[in-house]
C-alpha cells in the first residue's frame, strides 16, 4: 500500500527518484515495472505497479468501444499509458508527453493512493490541497453513507 506525499525532483532527463521506502515493495511486487497515464479528472499523472495496471486494463477491456463515453475513457487512459522501468538507482523515466500533460516541472509531489501514486506539479498540489480543505470546511452537501460510516 502506498501512502503519504513526498517532494521529489525530476532530473534534466525527466527521471524521478522513487523514495527508498517504496523501492523494495515495487521491486518485489512488479520487478520495478510500472505504467504511467493521465488522470481524467485532475491535472496529475497516475503511476501504477504493472500488476495493478493490468487489473485496470482488464476493466477497460470490458467497456464497449461502441459507447462514445466508454471509448473516450479507453482512448485517454490506454492511449496515454506509458511503461516505465525503475532502474538500479530507483529512478523512473517519465515520458515527455505525460510530463507536459500534467505540467510537471522540476519539483514533483509523489502522492501514495493505496495501489498507485499520483504525480503532481508541486505548486498545483498545494493549491489543490487548499481547495480540497476549503471545500470540505464550507460544504453544505450531506456526507455519503460511506463517509458517514468512516470513523477517524
Curated annotation (Swiss-Prot):
**Lineage, please?**
Bacteria, Pseudomonadati, Pseudomonadota, Gammaproteobacteria, Enterobacterales
What is the superkingdom listed in this entry's lineage? Answer: Bacteria
Family, similarity comment = Belongs to the MraZ family.
Q: Which organism is it from?
A: Erwinia tasmaniensis (strain DSM 17950 / CFBP 7177 / CIP 109463 / NCPPB 4357 / Et1/99)
Q: Could you tell me what this protein is called?
A: Transcriptional regulator MraZ
The record's subunit annotation is: Forms oligomers.
Gene Ontology molecular-function annotations: DNA-binding transcription factor activity; transcription cis-regulatory region binding
Question: What positions does the domain SpoVT-AbrB occupy?
Answer: 5-52, 81-124
The biological processes this protein is annotated with in GO are: negative regulation of DNA-templated transcription initiation
Q: Which GO terms describe its cellular component?
A: cytoplasm; nucleoid
The cross-references to CDD domains, in alphabetical order and at most eight, read: MraZ_C (cd16321), MraZ_N (cd16320)
Q: Which UniProt keywords apply?
A: Cytoplasm, DNA-binding, Repeat, Repressor, Transcription, Transcription regulation
Read off the PROSITE patterns from this record.
SPOVT_ABRB (PS51740)
